[in-house]
Amino acid sequence: MIQKNTLLDVADNSGARKVLCIGLLNGKKSASVGDVIVVSTKLITPRGKVSKGKVYKAVIVRVKKAVRRLDGSVIKFSSNAVVLINDQGDPLGTRVFGPIKKLPFGLFSKVMSLAVEVL
């Protein structure tokens, strides 16, 4: 579960490496896979598309907390990770690193198509 002031990894090549969650757009106190959050970049790579300290929207693609599926299986990852998106929901980067959990159907199909592995 992700809440305010959570430090997250970035799973794309937009130029950011670490971001800080500064707001949740689902109206709850915590967010999980597939939710959109507001983040501020904290650690960046040189010559990236993003700047340090700027505010972006991001979709959560991996969480450490175990998530139970309808068939009873459980999925959990070793890190909390997001993909930075623009206002239309398209990713800022052109690649997504690592496996991601299946996102809500139709909302982030571009993010899922860029991923190497979708669980």
Curated annotation (Swiss-Prot):
One of its GO terms (molecular function) is large ribosomal subunit rRNA binding. CDD domains: Ribosomal_uL14. It comes from the Bacteria. SMART domains: Ribosomal_L14. Keywords: Ribonucleoprotein, Ribosomal protein, RNA-binding, rRNA-binding. Gene3D superfamilies: Ribosomal protein L14 (2.40.150.20). GO terms for biological process: translation. Binds to 23S rRNA. Forms part of two intersubunit bridges in the 70S ribosome. PANTHER family: 50S/60S RIBOSOMAL PROTEIN L14/L23 (PTHR11761), LARGE RIBOSOMAL SUBUNIT PROTEIN UL14M (PTHR11761:SF3). Part of the 50S ribosomal subunit. Forms a cluster with proteins L3 and L19. In the 70S ribosome, L14 and L19 interact and together make contacts with the 16S rRNA in bridges B5 and B8. The keyword Transferase does not apply. The keyword Signal does not apply. Belongs to the universal ribosomal protein uL14 family. GO terms for cellular component: cytosolic large ribosomal subunit. This is Large ribosomal subunit protein uL14. Signal peptide: none annotated.
